[in-house]
């Protein structure tokens, strides 16, 4: 039998990528990877290491000890071989810290959101999501097979109207507690009241609230709403706790259900022991060094003053609106050239016309570092970028 006939392919099936790349480049929306050195040579105002714990010696030692005891990997799904005492200890301690009855670890904050939203909804459910909800919550809504209503940012009346007009038996309201792009706070008390009027569940992503608001325990705890039976929290271990992983925190019945029903939990390898050990140690540091959350907010306020941002920051995030993506890129590059690394948010991360510098404060910023930030940010924002603000 002869060799199969080769049909020539005149056009690569990936040729369309070239056109997409050109469009992104022309719009100033290309992204690239830039490895960071093991010892930073620039002032970091871009990472999510809010409490400065990723390099804390106790946190590193917690990860090292877990590696020595449990090995490098979890070795499998937590339902098979990937569960350890360490995982369950962190779940219990984190739940107690935020005032929840129980917790369940996931491999990231992203998968925690997928697991919670998809696992607690499905066909015949209504999901009401804030327009600025994190991408992981957006993707969870898409995967849920539920009907989804996206409401304007922080618009409680729109949420109430969506719940009031529903035909579905089950409903869920989804929001960040602290919105990542601009650092604004969700109206959690009002959202919970709307949920209770219409028998809906409230799911809150505390990724940017944990370690910063409520003395570290999160915005829900700060408002006196922790432990509510109709609220589920999600969070990440990769921001304030300086490690990696995610968690769903809420009633014990939710934990039990997600173990049975959350596909990102069932079919994913358990969180690596080193990450669990580091996060557990970080939680211990957060409890012991209670000055850290307040220092984050104080440093954020100082950064906002430097950048002439009129709103008082309510979180670690300071958003400097520049509008045009090319202007934002140029400003971020100028800061980096001067020794200060800042975030640069452009579409599709933020809406068109709202490209910005995103600064994140850390508890561990020294007076000398704040002075460097003042000098560089003032020079950059009073330069070419200022004309476009």
Swiss-Prot record:
Q: Which GO terms describe its biological process?
A: biotin biosynthetic process
Positions with a binding annotation for pyridoxal 5'-phosphate: 109-110, 180, 205-208, 236-239
The UniProt annotation places substrate binding at 31, 134, 349
Cofactors needed by this protein, per the record, are: pyridoxal 5'-phosphate
Q: What does this protein do?
A: Catalyzes the decarboxylative condensation of pimeloyl-[acyl-carrier protein] and L-alanine to produce 8-amino-7-oxononanoate (AON), [acyl-carrier protein], and carbon dioxide.
Q: How does it assemble?
A: Homodimer.
- The name of this protein is 8-amino-7-oxononanoate synthase
Q: What is the phylogenetic placement of the source species in the record?
A: Bacteria, Bacillati, Actinomycetota, Actinomycetes, Mycobacteriales
